[in-house]
Amino acid sequence: MQTGCEVLMQTASNVIQDKAAAAAGLKAAVRILDKWRATGEQGESILRVSHSSYARARRGDLAEIKLDSDQLARISYLLNIHAALRMLFENPDNVYGFVSMANHNPYFNGRTPLEVIGTGGDFAALYETFKRIDSLRGAQW
């Protein structure tokens, strides 16, 4: 049986690991957004982070950044959109350019996926965009 001190140390270790994973996810998400040529405002809206947090993430200064569950979910969807695009396309221009291409499917109605997810910070738009891009890959997972 663990002592109270051992439980606290284990909990602290889990928190540190979770913070490190969250920071790594944020850093990856910001890099992807940069490759998608998202503006800072779009990136901040998509991830629902402040201007200063986004700027720190771009610099790799992640020590003081705290993320809530909504922000972590947004990072997860963005990383999964990127993973789906990497499965669909071998050409890096398509992997990173797809989100900036006008899409005439009913949900997008001529808008780019980046316009849809980068306007207003709507979580549902991020989810719906992920769902539609993910469906393109069929059973490739």
PLM segments and residue spans:
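Non-transmembrane "mature" sequence context
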Residues: 1-141
